[in-house]
Amino acid sequence: LLRIAATLLPQNDPDFDLKSGPVAYWWLELDGIEGRREIGFDDRGDIVRFAPIGANRGVFVGEELAPHHLNESLTSQEFEQAWERALAGWRR
């Protein structure tokens, strides 16, 4: 299963796969059970990928793939601040 996921990720996030390290945790913006936006952080808390942007579809965006065992909630303001930080650092 992990090998399958590893082969799918490059198709979903072509701009990030060669440039970023592994994702330790995700922040997901959900519309019901469907992923709307996602931000992936490394183990230091740095943003290593986010979607959707450009050719990067993401892992959870537009799919009913959001994990059923979500942990803590965050405010929309916290998510938006992280999203803006990701956009500010976005380089193609």
Q: Over which residues does each language-model region extend?
A:
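Compositionally biased, intrinsically disordered low-complexity regions enriched for acidic
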Residues: 29-59
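Short, compact, well-ordered microdomains
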Residues: 51-92
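Residue-level detector of functional hotspots within protein domains
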Residues: 14-16, 25-27, 45, 60, ...
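Generic low-complexity, intrinsically disordered sequence content enriched
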Residues: 5-6, 13, 34, 69, ...
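Broad hydrophobic/π-residue packing in well-ordered secondary structure
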Residues: 24, 30, 79-83
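Generic preference for hydrophobic/aromatic residues in regular secondary structure cores
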Residues: 1-5, 28, 35, 71-73
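Negatively charged, low-complexity tracts enriched in Asp/Glu with abundant Ser/Thr
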Residues: 1-25
